[in-house]
Amino acid sequence: MEVTTNPPCNTALLEEYIPSGENPWTSQKIKHLYRRLAYGVNLAGIDATLPLTPATVVDSIIDTAINLPQTAAPSWGYFSISDFADFDLENPANVSQWYIQTAGDTIEGGLRARLTMFWMNHFVTELDSYGSYAPYMFQYYNLMQTHALGNFKEFVRAVGVNSTMLIYLNGFENTSNNPNENYARELFELFTLGENNNYTQEDIIQASRALTGYNHWDDPGAQIYFDQSTWDESPKTVFGSEEFYTYDELIDTLFELRETEIAQFICTKIYKYFVSHQYDVITQEDIINPLAQTLIDANFEMAPVLRQLFKSQHFFDDRALGIVIKNPYDV
C-alpha cells in the first residue's frame, strides 16, 4: 500500500460535517460533492442543494444510486453463439451499441455509474480474452451495476462464477485433473487481500482446487455453470484450515479468517478513488481503518461505509477539494 510518513495535508476526521460560520456549506463544497459522487452539477442543482444539510444530500445521492434500476438487458444479452443469425456481422454491431449505451449510463448514472466504473477497474477483465463477445460484456456490466453499492462479500462470490471472469482468468479451464491457479491468485492479490497480504503460495494452490468445477456450458457463448464431475472433492487446507471446501465455503472462509485485511484493502481503494490517491499512516489510522471497521460491522455492506466517508469532515475539508485527477468523463 502507498502509505507515506509525511504529515497529511487533510487532518480532518470522520466526524460528520456540520456547517458552521467558520466552515460554511458553500457552492464550492456542493460542486466538490457532485464532482466526486457524480459528474458535476449545474447552477440550478447548486441552488436546490444549498438549503439542505450535507448529510441529507449525501443520503439522497446514495439512496438514489441504490434504487436506480439496472440497465435493461438487450435482446442479445444472454445469447449463445448459435442464437445469432450471423455472428460475425451481429456481434461487432452489438459491441458498438453497448459502448454507446454504457457511455450514456456513465454520464447520467451519478454515484452508481461512478462505482460501476470503480468496480470494473477493480474486478478487471480484458475484452480480447473472451473475443469481445457482446453477451459477456453485458453480463459483466450488469453484475457491476447490480452489486455497485451492495454487499462486497456477495459481490466477490458472484464475480468468481461470472462467465466473463471464468474465461478471463481461466476458471473455465480449472478442473480437478488440471487445476489452474490464475483466479485464486487474483482473488487474493487483486480482489480481496492485496499483494502479499497474509496469504501464501500454498494457499493459492489449495484455493484453486476449491474453485474447480465451473467448466460447462450448454452451447459456446452460453452462461458457464458448475458440474460436480470436474470439481476437486478432496480436502484442501487454506489459511491453515482443512476442509473439503466448495466454492461458497472458500469465499465464506476467506471473509471469516481475513476480514480485517479485506476491509482495509477495499477501504483504502475507496479512499484513493473518492478522496485522494496519496495518504499517510495518520490517514490510515484515523480514516481508513475506522472505515474498514464500519465495513466489518456492517457485514461487508458498502453503503454504510460510503455514508460515513461522504458525510465526514474529512471528505468536505477544504484541503480535499480539487486534488483528484479527472478522467475523460469529468471534462
What name fits each language-model region?
Residues E2-F87, N91-V95, P135-Y141, Q145-V331:
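His/Asp/Glu-rich metal/cofactor-coordinating catalytic motifs and the adjacent surface-exposed loops
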Residues F84, N94-A113, M117:
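Structured, charged N-terminal subsegments at the starts of enzyme catalytic cores
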Residues L111-L115, L127-P135, S176-P179:
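Short, flexible active-site-proximal loops enriched in glycine and acidic residues
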